[in-house]
Amino acid sequence: MKKVLADKESLIEALKLALSTEYNVKRNFTQSVEIILTFKGIDMKKGDLKLREIVPLPKQPSKAKRVLVVPSFEQLEYAKKASPNVVITREELQKLQGQKRPVKKLARQNEWFLINQESMALAGRILGPALGPRGKFPTPLPNTADISEYINRFKRSVLVKTKDQPQVQVFIGTEDMKPEDLAENAIAVLNAIENKAKVETNLRNIYVKTTMGKAVKVKRA
């Protein structure tokens, strides 16, 4: 494992602290747990660091990501059986043309938008204007995909993406999960970006924290 990646033991140690009462005050909701990577010597305006990786988490968080699916006619029944949060047929998608309010609601409520290839252009026209400002996008649903496996994978997937600051902040689970499971999810995120340009040479620090809690710095070799 490369030196920029924190080992599992260091992650577990930091996560235990982040979940402790010293760093995390209990709220009346289940808080998310995030990993934060900060970078040095990066000019985001010049595009020095560009990350956009979809990462399936090995341990399913209790808060599954919401998935909207636009399947082909042949995929429709399989898609319904896989229990995504929303299933929309191509015909129903067409009827949303010009319907800004319901389209914005779908964009706001769902995280992933799996679109069969035959409907990608249509989805881009209808959903795109609402998805773009939210940093979301249609993802192709191949004709040959195992629908159930594909949908379930995205229910536990996160997007690792840089914005306008030299850092990335990624959901890795919820505070009711074991530190060991959260650490596995954190490692999946780190492994997905370790070979990207500027990550190894410009990584400053790694932190973990709950939604409302204090950040805990992860020890690195």
Swiss-Prot record:
Probably involved in E site tRNA release. Binds directly to 23S rRNA. Keywords: Repressor, Ribonucleoprotein, Ribosomal protein, RNA-binding, rRNA-binding, Translation regulation, tRNA-binding. It comes from the Archaea. GO terms for cellular component: large ribosomal subunit. GO terms for biological process: regulation of translation; translation. One of its GO terms (molecular function) is structural constituent of ribosome. PROSITE patterns: RIBOSOMAL_L1. It comes from Sulfolobus acidocaldarius (strain ATCC 33909 / DSM 639 / JCM 8929 / NBRC 15157 / NCIMB 11770). SUPFAM superfamilies: Ribosomal protein L1. Belongs to the universal ribosomal protein uL1 family. This is Large ribosomal subunit protein uL1. NCBIfam families: PRK04203.1. InterPro entries: Ribosomal_uL1 (IPR002143), Ribosomal_uL1-like (IPR023674), Ribosomal_uL1/biogenesis (IPR028364), Ribosomal_uL1_3-a/b-sand (IPR016095), Ribosomal_uL1_arc (IPR023669), Ribosomal_uL1_CS (IPR023673). It holds the Pfam family Ribosomal_L1. The gene is rpl1. Part of the 50S ribosomal subunit.
